């Protein structure tokens, strides 16, 4: 086997790396093209409301599929200011039975409108410091248009219909924010 000698701060002068992986002649299992084409994967919706810090990597891993060429994400984070006030953190509360039900409806609506494979909606509850994610929505699909449109629909509809409340915590005060996009708060 050929090898490459590397000298850098990461390796000693004697480090040798293979240029190609070793060949394994007698593989225990070699999937045929037919096996790979017939892979059927059940679609899934993963919904989670949690006080734990959200991870973009963990949420995006939930929607990966060999049948899909696109994963679209929306990540909402706490910004450090609002109308000239310094924001320290946000605090979220939700009416969980209704919130979970409404998010399930959003997932169902998405599946009626676009050919998507997997959907994950994670929303943080409790305190969310500046720069941390409060919501992550991930959608996978065969092609990008479906997942991009589905993610946009998901965040817009979530803000309009899901009973989640946000308190902005400033340096010297705090205030519960009304969601202007929420259907039950509109004056019409």
UniProtKB/Swiss-Prot annotation:
The keyword Transferase is annotated on this UniProt entry: yes
Pathway: Cofactor biosynthesis; molybdopterin biosynthesis
Tissue: Highest levels are found in heart and skeletal muscle. Lower levels are present in brain, kidney and pancreas. Very low levels are found in lung and peripheral blood leukocytes.
Localization in the cell: Cytoplasm, Cytosol
Main location: cytoplasm
Entry keyword set: Cytoplasm, Disease variant, Molybdenum cofactor biosynthesis, Phosphoprotein, Transferase
Cytoplasm is among the record's keywords: yes
EC number: 2.8.1.12
GO CC terms: cytosol; molybdopterin synthase complex; nuclear speck; nucleoplasm
Binding site for substrate: 143-144, 159, 166-168
Phosphoserine modified-residue sites: 20
Molecular function terms, GO-annotated: molybdopterin synthase activity
CDD domains: MoaE
Chemical reaction(s) catalysed: 2 [molybdopterin-synthase sulfur-carrier protein]-C-terminal-Gly-aminoethanethioate + cyclic pyranopterin phosphate + H2O = molybdopterin + 2 [molybdopterin-synthase sulfur-carrier protein]-C-terminal Gly-Gly + 2 H(+)
GO biological process: Mo-molybdopterin cofactor biosynthetic process; molybdopterin cofactor biosynthetic process
Family as reported in the entry's similarity comment: Belongs to the MoaE family. MOCS2B subfamily.
Role of this protein: Catalytic subunit of the molybdopterin synthase complex, a complex that catalyzes the conversion of precursor Z into molybdopterin. Acts by mediating the incorporation of 2 sulfur atoms from thiocarboxylated MOCS2A into precursor Z to generate a dithiolene group.
Known partners and oligomeric status: Heterotetramer; composed of 2 small (MOCS2A) and 2 large (MOCS2B) subunits.
Clinical disorder: Molybdenum cofactor deficiency B: An autosomal recessive metabolic disorder characterized by neonatal onset of intractable seizures, opisthotonus, and facial dysmorphism associated with hypouricemia and elevated urinary sulfite levels. Affected individuals show severe neurologic damage and often die in early childhood.
Protein name: Molybdopterin synthase catalytic subunit
Gene responsible for this protein: MOCS2
